[in-house]
Design a protein with these regions (language model features):
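Histidine-anchored nucleotide/phosphate-binding helix
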Residues: 8-25, 303-318
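A donor-sugar binding/catalytic signature common to diverse glycosyltransferases
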Residues: 12, 134-135, 160, 356-404
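C-terminal amphipathic helix plus adjacent low-complexity
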Residues: 190-247, 268-274, 409-500
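Conserved nucleotide-sugar donor-interacting segment of glycosyltransferase catalytic cores
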Residues: 118-182
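Nucleotide-activated donor-dependent transferases that construct or modify glycoconjugates
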Residues: 1-12, 35-36, 105, 133, ...
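Catalytic donor nucleotide-activated moiety binding site of glycosyltransferases and closely related
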Residues: 312-356
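Active-site donor-nucleotide binding/catalytic segment of nucleotide-sugar enzymes
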Residues: 279-315, 322, 328-332
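Conserved N-terminal ligand/cofactor-binding loop architecture of enzyme catalytic domains
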Residues: 21-120, 164-267, 488-499
Length: 500
């Protein structure tokens, strides 16, 4: 059977690299949607490494200028696809809260949505794909196309993380194993908690994340080269790509200067103010903060993006003899930390202690009575240390009897009481891990992403950069073994879904 496959091409190039090996491994027609900047676009227009039957350049089809949205069309679209457009749009980091360069109007946002929807409908109607290969859906327009594929029963092949260390899986839904429906029938391997914790320790990604953060931004030479290239460029992307609207050279330089100042001030505040020593023998609930402006919050938990408000709700819901220990996420450094006003707001909440990002998460989990998380890995890690957890998003491990998902904030107080009295059983966790072992594979996504940033984007300092086939060939050779492994995992899922 000849498969029709649409591939989402972005600046990390992972899906493009997989496509290179995939085209020679199965009988398929490859199509692509390229979401790229102006300087990357010529590479995809002229490349000869992957035989794409057709490539649509997303940004070429989208303009927010002087457009009046067709509300009737969008209204009908929502009914057909059962997609809440405003829920996606209001959580788009480019549209609201996190954009320092351009304030999008209602008409601009809805015009972008209308053009995106029409383009995606056109592509799906023309190709009628069997599969869609994508990265995790970090931006709303990719999430939109992803949801449209699910509605049309197109199988999605998404590289994502199973919330367990240096590993990955290719699944239809983000952070949810495809075999999750088999949980009840999956047999435990009879591993006790000590054996399960040994399994976890072998996978732990703490060092990998720290290395990624250390490499973030590259070398001083990378920063200087990126600045020089940017200042000498025509900066055409600022006019053609809506995520870059308002990013004039002067405003970018100003913003970078202010960011560097804020970064130093905030880091100093974090080091001086956030707690590094606490009494772990007291009764406490542990809440690890998620990184703001990330998928985990904006798409994974769209109704729970205000973490400070969540902290207030938790404190209001605690039994009288409990405290809330909150830990800052080390990854927040990549976003220049939080504002001093946000830190003041958090630390002013009574019965709450804000921990320094260097404090051991494992110690906090081990000594807590309950872990509450928006939807990251901490809720799953809690089970390894015999602790119940509460989450706010749909995620694979919520099948565990010791994991409780909040879908109505009014239920939080009662859910906390129930969770605190819930015992964690090793056989429940072992069944879930046994299920995961059938899907996950070894893959350090942080290291791979860092390598691509170093090799293509000057350490991540310049994403609107010129790319050559010579660079891509070098990456294909250097990472051949890893990329073939990723390709094989995609083929496994293609074969699996084809038999259904």
């Amino acid at each position: 059977m000849r498969y029709k496959i649409i591939v989402w091409l972005g600046s990390d190039f992972t899906q493009y690299l997989v496509s290179y090996f995939l085209q020679n491994s199965i009988d398929c027609e490859l199509y692509a949607i390229a979401d790229t900047t102006s300087k990357i676009k010529p590479f995809f227009e002229n490349q000869t490494l992957v035989n794409f039957k057709k490539i649509w350049f997303f940004q070429d089809r989208i303009s927010a200028q002087n457009q009046t949205p067709d509300i009737k069309y969008l209204e009908n679209f929502e009914k057909i696809f059962e997609i809440n457009i405003w829920k996606l749009a209001i959580n788009e980091r480019i549209f609201y809260r996190f954009n320092d360069y351009h304030k999008f109007s209602r008409n601009e946002i809805l015009s972008i949505e209308e053009q995106s929807c029409k383009l995606f409908e056109e592509i799906l109607n023309e190709v009628k794909p069997d599969f869609f290969i994508t990265k995790e859906t970090a931006f709303h327009h990719l999430e939109l196309f992803y949801q449209m594929c699910l509605k049309n029963q197109i199988q999605v092949l998404m590289i994502n993380q199973p919330n367990l260390g240096k590993s990955a899986m290719v699944t239809n839904k983000c952070r949810i194993p495809d075999f999750i429906k088999n949980y009840e029938s999956t047999k435990s391997k009879n591993r006790d908690f000590n054996e399960l914790r040994t399994f976890l320790e072998k996978l732990e990604s703490g060092g990998s994340i720290q290395n990624y953060l250390a490499r973030h931004g590259g070398t001083k030479y990378d920063s200087f080269s990126a600045a020089s290239k940017f200042l000498k460029s025509d900066n055409s992307t600022e006019k053609t790509n809506y995520p870059y609207y308002g990013r004039t050279k002067l405003d970018v330089v100003k913003n970078e200067f202010l960011s560097s100042q804020n970064r130093r001030k905030r880091k100093s505040f974090v080091d001086k103010t956030l707690q590094k020593n606490v009494d772990l023998k007291t009764h406490f609930v542990y809440f690890p903060l998620s990184v703001d402006m990330e998928r985990n919050l904006l798409i994974g938990a769209p109704m729970y993006t205000n973490q400070i408000e969540i902290l207030r709700h938790i404190v209001k819901s605690l039994p009288i003899n409990y405290q809330l220990f909150v830990k800052e996420n080390p990854g927040q450094s990549s976003r220049d930390w939080r504002s001093l006003e946000e830190y003041d707001e958090i630390t002013s909440i009574p019965n709450l202690t804000l921990m320094h990002p260097s404090f051991s998460s494992r110690k906090l989990i081990e000594n807590s009575d309950l872990v509450i998380s928006i939807g990251g890995s901490s809720g799953l890690e809690a089970a390894f240390y015999e602790k119940p957890s509460i989450i706010f998003s749909e995620i694979g491990y919520d099948v565990l009897p010791s994991v409780f998902r909040v879908q109505n904030i009014d239920e939080l107080s009662n859910t906390i009481k129930i969770a605190l009295n819930t015992k964690v059983y090793s056989q429940d966790l072992d069944r879930y891990i046994s299920l995961l072992e059938n899907e996950m594979f070894s893959f350090d996504s942080f290291e791979f992403t860092s390598d691509l940033k170093d090799e293509l984007f000057l350490g991540g300092n310049l994403h609107d950069n010129t790319i050559s086939e010579k660079q891509i060939k070098k990456i294909l050779t250097k990472h051949e073994s890893l990329l073939k492994k990723l390709t094989d995992e995609h083929i496994k899922k293609i074969n699996y879904f084809s038999k259904k």
